[in-house]
Every structure is written in structure tokens, then in C-alpha cells.
Amino acid sequence: MTQAGTRSTNGDTENTDILAQARQQVLERGEGLSRDQVLQMLWLPDDRLEELLALAHDVRMRWCGPEVEIEGIISLKTGGCPEDCHFCSQSGLFMSPVRSAWLDIRSLVEAAKQTAKSGATEFCIVAAVRGPDERLMSQVAAGIEAIRNEVEINIACSLGMLTVEQVEQLSGIGVHRYNHNLETARSFFTNVVTTHTWEERWQTLSMVRDAGMEVCCGGILGMGETVEQRAEFALELAELGPDEVPLNFLNPRPGTPFGALEVMPPSEALKSVAAFRLALPRTILRFAGGREITLGDLGAKQGMLGGINAVIVGNYLTTLGRPAEADLRLLDDLQMPIKALNASL
């Protein structure tokens, strides 16, 4: 499903006024857009896209600065997940080619080393689980200790839903940031996942924040949600107030319920990037999975000039990403400095 709802028909003058109002509100005062204002941005005609992206870039530069945060991710435990997230090839409930596997500690350390060599300040350890059991928590603790002995990098984790005790344990071993995506608007969530609730995810995020870890929470666009629901999602994230929002775009995976969905049109994806920046002016907004197939090289450049200030380099969990060298070359071409580790501690 692409753009839906009743669009404004008053022409370029109204669109210009909308952008002028957004410039005053977000750029000058640092106040994020409301749901209805985000919706207006998503409804802008394509001939206003360049102006929208320019405004989002100005907002990013004003409230976040020119630096770009680089992150690498690694799957500690792949596949065999009991949850039914309809976009995910790691679910054990679907006829996916992905099979369950564990990464050994030595390989985890080597991956962290390679990530650090790319200039990254963040290394995220991910596991395909509903939530971690004792074995996984022990493996994560051992992996983090091994990485810290050899690599200077911030460590993040994404291990599903947590208990209070697990949150405290991760905080205690020095996890810098915890990722748990809400994935989509609350009103659309049951179309994406049925084995747990949106509220359960929110609860984990609240506990993470209370424990003093940074919160990383975003989602996937292009899963059949309406444009109204994209605006709803942006404001739900603004209410949560995460330190980082990773924006993924659906890359339909064979064997999953969403495997036959169409890829999101590039103009919609770029409008979404800009609109989310205007809703979240001070948040780290990260290009994540699906940008390669959705936007290509040109769209990646437009996104970096349209509100994005962080990227995941290298491959994702079960799909190929852009080579790290390509992203680093793009940042160099755009004269965007990479955030240094000592600036992020």
C-alpha cells in the first residue's frame, strides 16, 4: 500500500507555507512536527521533494551537527526465532532458507575489529530470539569481555524483550545502547506480528531507559502501512524519545508473509526520511536495512543530504548491505566527518 488518505489540493502556495512553517518551528525553535504536520510532509508532491530534503538537512546540521555515526552489526544467534514477525526470514515459523546457527566468540571479536577499522564507533550484537535465555546472556557477556580486551568500540545489543534482571545485567557489563524496534505504528502492529504485542516492546524500552542505557528504536517502512500510519509511527517514536532511530525499508524476503510485497518507491522513502527528521530534530537518524534495494546509490546520497546522520556499514543480519568502502567514500565526497569514538563516550 502506498500513499493513502485525503490530500491537500490547494497547490504550491500551501505547500510552500507548510515548509515555511516547518522551517520556523523545527529549524529555528527545535520543536518537532505534530502528527498532522508530518502527514503533510509525506503528502507533498514529488516536485517539492528537493526542498523538503534541504530543510531536513538544515535541521540535522543545526541540531545534530555535521558528524556521521558509523555502526556495524553482527548476528550472534541466527534463525530459529519463535516469533512470527512477517518481514523476518529468521522466524522458525516460515519456510525460509535461513537456518539456526551460533557465532563463536573468536569470530565475534574479529567482526568487532573489522567494524572498528571502518571508523565505526558502535558495534551491535544481535540475536534472533523472543528474549534471551541464560545461555545467550552468558554468551553475550563472554563476547563483550573478549571484545573489550582487544577492541576500542562502544558495544550495543539487540536481544529481544528483556526482564528487569536482564536489563540490569546488560547495563552492568557496559552495554552502551540497546536496540529494540517498535517496527511500525501501534495501530498496524498486529498486521506485522501476532506472537507478542507492541506494548511488550515498549515496556522493554522503558526499562532500558530507566537503567541508564541509551535507547535505539526504529522500524521498517513499506510493510503495507498507510501514510497516516507512518505519521503515527513518527510521533510514537517522538513520544518515546530514543537516542537513535534506525530507519529500515522492507526488503521482501522469500518464504516470509511479506515476501511478495513491492519495494517502497524511492520518493516515498526519501519523504519519510525527511519527515522523520522533522519529527525528531535532535535524534540520531540512521540509514539501516533495505536502503540499497529501495534507494540505490543516488537515493543514498539524497538521504544523507535529507536528514540522515548515521549509517550501518557492511552487511545486515540476513541481507547484503553496501560495502563499507562505498559508504565511507560517499561521506568523504559529501565532506561529512565521521564521529570519533572519544566524542561518543
From Swiss-Prot:
Protein name (database record): Biotin synthase
Which is one Pfam family of this protein?
Answer: Radical_SAM
Q: In which pathway does it act?
A: Cofactor biosynthesis; biotin biosynthesis; biotin from 7,8-diaminononanoate: step 2/2
> Which Gene3D superfamilies does the UniProt record give?
Aldolase class I
Q: S-adenosyl-L-methionine: present as a keyword of the record?
A: yes
Which species does this protein come from? Mycobacterium leprae (strain TN)
User: Which keywords does the record carry?
Assistant: 2Fe-2S, 4Fe-4S, Biotin biosynthesis, Iron, Iron-sulfur, Metal-binding, S-adenosyl-L-methionine, Transferase
Report the catalytic activity.
(4R,5S)-dethiobiotin + (sulfur carrier)-SH + 2 reduced [2Fe-2S]-[ferredoxin] + 2 S-adenosyl-L-methionine = (sulfur carrier)-H + biotin + 2 5'-deoxyadenosine + 2 L-methionine + 2 oxidized [2Fe-2S]-[ferredoxin]
User: Which residues are [4Fe-4S] cluster-binding?
Assistant: 81, 85, 88
- Functional note: Catalyzes the conversion of dethiobiotin (DTB) to biotin by the insertion of a sulfur atom into dethiobiotin via a radical-based mechanism.
Q: Which GO terms describe its molecular function?
A: 2 iron, 2 sulfur cluster binding; 4 iron, 4 sulfur cluster binding; biotin synthase activity; iron ion binding
Q: Name one GO biological process term.
A: biotin biosynthetic process
Detail which positions bind [2Fe-2S] cluster.
124, 157, 216, 286
Please name the HAMAP family in this protein's record: BioB
Q: Which family does it belong to?
A: Belongs to the radical SAM superfamily. Biotin synthase family.
User: Where do the TM regions start and end?
Assistant: none
The UniProt entry, under InterPro entries, shows: Aldolase_TIM (IPR013785), BATS_dom (IPR010722), Biotin_synth/BioAB (IPR002684), Biotin_synthase (IPR024177), Elp3/MiaA/NifB-like_rSAM (IPR006638), rSAM (IPR007197)
Please state every residue range assigned to the domain named Radical SAM core. Answer: 66-291
Record-listed E.C. numbers? 2.8.1.6
Give the cofactors, semicolon-separated: [4Fe-4S] cluster; [2Fe-2S] cluster
- Is Ion transport set as a keyword in this record? no
Cofactor note as given? Binds 1 [4Fe-4S] cluster. The cluster is coordinated with 3 cysteines and an exchangeable S-adenosyl-L-methionine.
Task: Quote the subunit structure annotation.
Answer: Homodimer.
